[in-house]
Curated annotation (Swiss-Prot):
<keyword id="KW-0113">Calvin cycle</keyword>
<comment type="subunit">
    <text>Heterohexadecamer of 8 large and 8 small subunits.</text>
</comment>
<dbReference type="Pfam" id="PF12338">
    <property type="entry name" value="RbcS"/>
</dbReference>
<dbReference type="InterPro" id="IPR000894">
    <property type="entry name" value="RuBisCO_ssu_dom"/>
</dbReference>
<dbReference type="GO" id="GO:0009853">
    <property type="term" value="P:photorespiration"/>
</dbReference>
<keyword id="KW-0601">Photorespiration</keyword>
<dbReference type="InterPro" id="IPR036385">
    <property type="entry name" value="RuBisCO_ssu_sf"/>
</dbReference>
<protein>
    <recommendedName>
        <fullName>Ribulose bisphosphate carboxylase small subunit, chloroplastic 6</fullName>
    </recommendedName>
</protein>
<dbReference type="InterPro" id="IPR024681">
    <property type="entry name" value="RuBisCO_ssu"/>
</dbReference>
<dbReference type="Pfam" id="PF00101">
    <property type="entry name" value="RuBisCO_small"/>
</dbReference>
<dbReference type="GO" id="GO:0009507">
    <property type="term" value="C:chloroplast"/>
</dbReference>
<keyword id="KW-0934">Plastid</keyword>
<keyword id="KW-0602">Photosynthesis</keyword>
<keyword id="KW-0809">Transit peptide</keyword>
<dbReference type="GO" id="GO:0019253">
    <property type="term" value="P:reductive pentose-phosphate cycle"/>
</dbReference>
<comment type="function">
    <text>RuBisCO catalyzes two reactions: the carboxylation of D-ribulose 1,5-bisphosphate, the primary event in carbon dioxide fixation, as well as the oxidative fragmentation of the pentose substrate. Both reactions occur simultaneously and in competition at the same active site. Although the small subunit is not catalytic it is essential for maximal activity.</text>
</comment>
<dbReference type="InterPro" id="IPR024680">
    <property type="entry name" value="RuBisCO_ssu_N"/>
</dbReference>
Length: 186
């Protein structure tokens, strides 16, 4: 029993001397940093509201989506209707990403609705009718806009959207409403 106590004490003193040597060679943390109290700092009291931070009054706030009376459709639905120029830019964006443009229309509902239960299910308002075939090989946004105009003439009371489809990953990457019927007032 005495031998076990001796060996434990010897191990403890050897370990202590090793750790002391290791600590001596290490740099102490925060060496050379000065205390905060060394720098004079003037702080305003939390009750002083005489000056408010400002960026010079050049803030232009965007109006948020009104919660009542308007339905949100898809991407870009919170913006005003797209002009032809901005529509061409959006189509060019999806073409630049290598996505295949496709037009779809919905004659009655341009939004997700509840038909088969209390919560919108997978089929409730998510499937639209495809306008012709996807435009594989399309390189010019004006071709897509021409098809959009043709779809508007054929179905003037339908919602029409443009989809960007990635045929490699086989996913829909972008979808936005390109036309809302004149009878839709919200």
């Amino acid at each position: 029993m005495a031998s076990s106590m001796l060996s434990n004490a010897a191990v403890a003193t050897t370990a202590a001397s090793r750790s002391a040597g290791a600590q001596a060679s290490m740099v102490a943390p925060f060496t050379g940093l000065k205390s905060v109290s060394a720098f004079p700092v003037t702080r305003k009291s939390s009750n002083d509201l005489s000056t408010v931070p400002s960026n010079g009054g050049k803030v232009q706030c965007m109006q948020v989506w009104p919660p009542l009376g308007k339905k949100k459709f898809e991407t870009l639905s919170y913006l005003p209707p797209l002009s032809e120029e901005s529509l061409l830019k959006e189509v060019q964006y999806l073409l630049n990403n290598g996505w295949v443009p496709c037009l779809e229309f919905e004659p009655t509902h341009g939004f997700v609705y509840r038909e088969h239960g209390n919560t919108p299910g997978y089929y409730d308002g998510r499937y639209w009718t495809m306008w012709k075939l996807p435009m594989f090989g399309c390189t010019d946004p004006s071709q897509v806009v021409a098809e959009l105009e043709e779809a508007k003439k054929a179905y003037p009371e339908a919602f029409i959207r443009i989809i960007g489809f990635d045929n490699v990953r086989q996913v829909q990457c972008v979808s936005f409403i390109a036309y809302k019927p004149a009878s839709y007032d919200a």
